[in-house]
């Protein structure tokens, strides 16, 4: 069977910005028969995420992410439907997901590496398993729970950078749900600021591209900052940390402003900012959601419940077609998305 797949065509270079041309689509032949334990799946939706920028380098700089190889298929979060199965626990018509889904229209996969999902958890919105009711949702929920030290009724202020992205848009809402009295988002357009305050319930939003970020933050956070959900790093984070209170907490989710730079992760803070962090006893620890697998199942159920109750609003930016994986990735890395960036590969989930 001839299918289409996306392979890594070139590397951006250690400090280069990724472009769509770093990827290419090619035809590929799948075996005609399945081995025991395998399933044939049709891909419905694929995810593009900031962490993938690290996988474009020869060395990812982390021990839990393997780099993509040139001329080899790229992979990431994906969801699809089983078309044929030689696996004991999976049957034709099952919906399955994986963190290592190949960027292909169809694939033959080891059934043990797939997780069966229940469409009822997302009211039929299968792509949500790649966002709010999937890894970004778990990253936001577990990150805030484990590293935010939020206690309801203690009048805490939370700031979220990259607030209109997949994790940021969820983290701010979760901050409110867990007890923060004030949540402020930082993003890069007025449209995104309005989205945060009018649709997601953020109390204020700061546009880092207009005006002085530190001044806007002082106005939005008169009592200082107690919890900082950091998606971006760099100058924005330095401005936030400078206004954090004593014994406050940084949830280090990502550093998208630094992913194209050849620096260690997490990047060290400038000496003046690091001095503030130490003086005020601000915690700043790397957070990796994969270290909390025991919390995944209850986390997914909690996220699904909030979504069904209308307490957790979900926003997606949807591209269409496998040929647009590179375009969608480049757009997401430059802030072109609101909410989770998804690529629809096949809309028809029926068999």
From Swiss-Prot:
It is an enzyme of class 1 (oxidoreductase). GO terms for molecular function: 15-oxoprostaglandin 13-oxidase [NAD(P)+] activity. The keyword NADP applies. Substrate binds at residues 99-100, 288-290. NADP(+) binds at residues 165-168, 192, 208, 231, 253-259, 287-289, 337. It catalyses: 13,14-dihydro-15-oxo-prostaglandin E2 + NAD(+) = 15-oxoprostaglandin E2 + NADH + H(+); 13,14-dihydro-15-oxo-prostaglandin E2 + NADP(+) = 15-oxoprostaglandin E2 + NADPH + H(+); 13,14-dihydro-15-oxo-PGF2alpha + NADP(+) = 15-oxoprostaglandin F2alpha + NADPH + H(+); 13,14-dihydro-15-oxo-prostaglandin E1 + NADP(+) = 15-oxoprostaglandin E1 + NADPH + H(+). Belongs to the NADP-dependent oxidoreductase L4BD family. Functions as 15-oxo-prostaglandin 13-reductase and acts on 15-keto-PGE1, 15-keto-PGE2, 15-keto-PGE1-alpha and 15-keto-PGE2-alpha with highest activity towards 15-keto-PGE2. Overexpression represses transcriptional activity of PPARG and inhibits adipocyte differentiation. Monomer. This is Prostaglandin reductase 2.
